[in-house]
């Protein structure tokens, strides 16, 4: 059993998600101690519990200590079963963070898996569903991940109520070299249970700033009913994306400009993937090998690298230049 210090680095929930995902995939039991030790509310939060329970169900794992507020758990995985599963995170817990946790493990399932996840689709401190679909998954496909994803209903803070469906097939992971893709900018601006002009103003402000900086873009408008009112915008070009969420007291124009500015920062760097995707791809480059560049190495990325190296006994290197190059020969 491998022991993981959950307080290492940024000491957040990502250590838990990555550890349990790689444990499930490899069959290696893990003990995680000091979970979120330095956070205002230490221990497992509800969405971490749901993620561990979901992987335990899919892999018929034995678990110890998996409950709200727990600072130490053990996870002893079994075989990863095919089938259909439902996971309700509750309120507006992030569906994309849970899928990030499930996806590496599901590549090694015995057969096709379909997971329906209910919770928050566009919430703070996590990728949006549009980012997952249009930026992260296409990059993961290059590593051999065979998965499709659709959002059936958006869910905003605080009630959530979003519904997404992830379908996977057994995948043979392979090394991938992610090159810079220079292509047009696309986007989706959306609002739920709010007037359509909210989404349109977000899009118009983003388009204006992008045009001012010399970029053309196409942004689709989506409106729908939702359990809680909310809005957001996601922009992308190749493997670089950005997003911003509306909130009470913030003008729609400011939301649009926030997303546009973040994407412009990524495009100017000439790196092949954005800062957040660099973090999300660590399990795949650790398993299969490959390389990509990013403009910055976040604390999340460094912590994820440390976690993957602890479990997989692989080596992931970072070369610093005008951009950072992350590369690995994998764990095979």
UniProtKB/Swiss-Prot annotation:
GO molecular function, one term: RNA-3'-phosphate cyclase activity
Gene3D superfamilies named among the record's database cross-references: RNA 3'-terminal phosphate cyclase domain (3.65.10.20), RNA 3'-terminal phosphate cyclase, insert domain (3.30.360.20)
Keywords in alphabetical order: ATP-binding, Cytoplasm, Ligase, Nucleotide-binding
KW Cytoplasm (keyword) present: yes
Active site (record annotation): 300 (tele-amp-histidine intermediate)
Family indicated by similarity: Belongs to the RNA 3'-terminal cyclase family. Type 1 subfamily.
Protein's name in the database: RNA 3'-terminal phosphate cyclase
Organism: Methanothrix thermoacetophila (strain DSM 6194 / JCM 14653 / NBRC 101360 / PT) (Methanosaeta thermophila)
Gene: rtcA
């Amino acid at each position: 059993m491998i022991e993981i210090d959950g307080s290492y680095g940024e000491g957040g929930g990502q250590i838990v998600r990555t550890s349990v995902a790689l444990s499930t995939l490899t069959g290696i039991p893990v003990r995680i101690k000091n979970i979120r030790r330095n956070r205002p509310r230490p221990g497992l939060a509800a969405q971490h519990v749901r993620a561990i329970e979901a992987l335990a169900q899919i892999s018929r794992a034995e678990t110890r200590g998996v409950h709200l507020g727990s600072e130490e758990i053990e996870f002893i995985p079994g075989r990863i079963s095919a089938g259909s599963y439902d996971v309700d995170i509750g309120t507006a817990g992030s569906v994309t963070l849970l899928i990030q946790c499930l996806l590496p493990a599901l590549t090694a399932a015995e057969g096709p898996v379909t997971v329906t996840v209910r919770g928050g689709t566009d919430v703070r401190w996590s990728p949006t569903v549009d980012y997952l679909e249009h930026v992260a998954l296409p990059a993961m496909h290059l590593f051999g991940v065979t998965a499709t994803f659709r959002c059936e209903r958006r869910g905003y803070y605080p009630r959530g109520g979003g519904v997404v469906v992830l379908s996977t097939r057994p995948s043979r992971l392979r090394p991938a070299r992610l090159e810079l893709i220079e292509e047009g900018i696309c986007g989706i601006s959306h609002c739920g249970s709010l007037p359509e002009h909210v989404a349109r103003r977000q899009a118009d402000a983003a388009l204006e700033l992008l045009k001012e900086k010399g970029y053309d873009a196409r942004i689709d408008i989506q409106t729908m009913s939702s359990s809680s009112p909310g809005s957001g915008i996601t922009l992308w070009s190749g493997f670089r994306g950005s997003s911003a969420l509306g909130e009470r007291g913030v003008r729609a124009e400011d939301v649009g400009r926030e997303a546009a500015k973040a994407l412009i920062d990524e495009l100017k760097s000439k790196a092949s993937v954005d800062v957040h995707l660099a973090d999300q791809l660590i399990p795949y480059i650790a398993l299969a090998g490959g390389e990509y560049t990013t403009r910055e190495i976040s604390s999340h990325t460094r912590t994820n690298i440390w976690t993957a190296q602890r479990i997989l006994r692989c080596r992931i290197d970072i070369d610093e230049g005008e951009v950072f190059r992350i590369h690995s020969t994998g764990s095979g």
